[in-house]
Swiss-Prot record:
Its EC number is 3.6.1.55. Coiled coil: none annotated. GO terms for molecular function: 8-oxo-7,8-dihydrodeoxyguanosine triphosphate pyrophosphatase activity; 8-oxo-7,8-dihydroguanosine triphosphate pyrophosphatase activity; 8-oxo-dGDP phosphatase activity; 8-oxo-GDP phosphatase activity; metal ion binding. Mg(2+) binds at residues 40, 60. InterPro entries: Mutator_MutT, MutT-like, MutY_C, Nudix_hydrolase, NUDIX_hydrolase-like_dom_sf, NUDIX_hydrolase_CS, NUDIX_hydrolase_dom. The keyword Magnesium applies. Keywords: DNA damage, DNA repair, DNA replication, Hydrolase, Magnesium, Metal-binding, Mutator protein. Gene3D superfamilies: Nucleoside Triphosphate Pyrophosphohydrolase. Specifically hydrolyzes both 8-oxo-deoxyguanosine triphosphate (8-oxo-dGTP) and 8-oxo-guanosine triphosphate (8-oxo-GTP) to the related monophosphates, thereby cleaning up the nucleotide pools and preventing misincorporation of 8-oxoGua into DNA and RNA. It prevents replicational errors by removing an oxidatively damaged form of guanine (8-oxo-dGTP) from DNA and the nucleotide pool. 8-oxo-dGTP can be inserted opposite dA and dC residues of template DNA with almost equal efficiency thus leading to A.T to G.C transversions. This is 8-oxo-dGTP diphosphatase. The gene is mutT. It is an enzyme of class 3 (hydrolase). It comes from the Bacteria. It catalyses: 8-oxo-dGTP + H2O = 8-oxo-dGMP + diphosphate + H(+); 8-oxo-GTP + H2O = 8-oxo-GMP + diphosphate + H(+).
């Protein structure tokens, strides 16, 4: 039996002052393409989950996070991989939310 690929992902639950939450749709050709998710990405070597979150949100949606708090870390086994997800509540940032080409199909602020 082959070992499953192991990934650690940092994701941001981006909540504005009006309690709107930003979600993004995964590119159709990616793993789980078309699904909706909180933006973020994989940790690089020697990177903490918070460092990965800050880097990924800048790369994917153009924001510089100034305030975030770890909400929870959960693990899930898919048939082909083991994923650890670290979720952060993001409440303050600089710059406007901008969908960068290739990072997501579309993003939306949803009212809770």
């Amino acid at each position: 039996m082959m070992d499953k690929k192991k990934l650690h992902i940092a994701a941001g639950v981006i909540c504005d002052k009006h309690n709107n939450v930003f979600i993004a749709q995964r590119p159709l050709k990616s793993h789980m393409g078309g699904f909706w998710e909180f933006p973020g990405g994989k940790l690089e070597d020697n990177e903490t989950p918070e460092q990965a979150l800050l880097r990924e949100l800048q790369e994917e949606i153009g924001i510089d996070v100034t305030q975030c708090t770890l909400l929870d870390t959960v693990a899930h086994d898919f048939p082909d991989r083991h994923i650890t997800l670290s979720f952060f509540l993001v409440t303050e940032w600089k710059n406007e939310l901008t969908e960068k080409k290739g990072s997501c199909r579309v993003g939306h602020l949803l009212c809770l």
